[in-house]
Amino acid sequence: MKITWLGHAAFRLDFAGTAVLIDPFLTHNPVFKGDVAEVSKGVSHILLTHGHSDHIGDTAGIVKAAEAEGRKVIVVANPEVCGFLSGQGLSAFEPMNTGGTVKLDGFSVTMVRADHSSGGDGSNPTYLGNPNGLIVKAAGEPTLWHLGDTDLFSDMALISEIHQPKVAIVPIGDRFTMGPETAALAVRRFISAETVVPCHYGTFPLLVPDASGFVAALQGHSAKVVVPNSGESFEV
């Protein structure tokens, strides 16, 4: 599996001839320096953890650009987010919710708990369902857990026990999610992954600017901490 960090909580996964995007907040993401068309090339699915604009991001634009090329990109999200995006002209969805699993073309996605909120922006925000983390599984590939936006909770241990993730993508930015020390505690205490990737930091002034505190808090822990630059890929 090749994992590419696109800044904030956005990632591209390439595995077994499949390419998916998670939370593709790109155009208005100051950390993303790439080209939206390039990073979405060949993508078959977009997986969304929740309905905040810094996670839905470029979903509608990517799907419509693919349709103009004769390709279909399917959005995997909770029903409320699917409904919201249908109002933007999208029609190809795999709706699901917390605890459920959807089997797709050569891989599966399971939604798991995240402690956060989920709604549209503005003075009268739209309710967009519950936030979630995502478990991505494919035969012969390491299981990946994108935690979404969340605080620490002890049932992370149960999620680890059930799904046995080898890779965990963990928010560390503080204020809106766990901060570095709490995220490191989650990894030490509850998350069994062999490889840990921090995200949701350095995007805006309100967030922790870098991953150094997270890395320091995990010194001596068995998990490998990978801190890619925006646009950088690594393989697991």
UniProtKB/Swiss-Prot annotation:
Query: Which residues does UniProt assign to the signal peptide?
Result: none
UniProt KW Hydrolase keyword: yes
| InterPro entries in the record | Metallo-B-lactamas, RibonucZ/Hydroxyglut_hydro, UPF0173, UPF0173_UPF0282_UlaG_hydrolase
* Name this polypeptide is given: UPF0173 metal-dependent hydrolase AZC_2841
User: Is this entry keyworded Hydrolase?
Assistant: yes
The alphabetized UniProt keywords are: Hydrolase
- Species name: Azorhizobium caulinodans (strain ATCC 43989 / DSM 5975 / JCM 20966 / LMG 6465 / NBRC 14845 / NCIMB 13405 / ORS 571)
Q: Which family does it belong to?
A: Belongs to the UPF0173 family.
Provide a Gene Ontology MF annotation, just one.
Answer: hydrolase activity
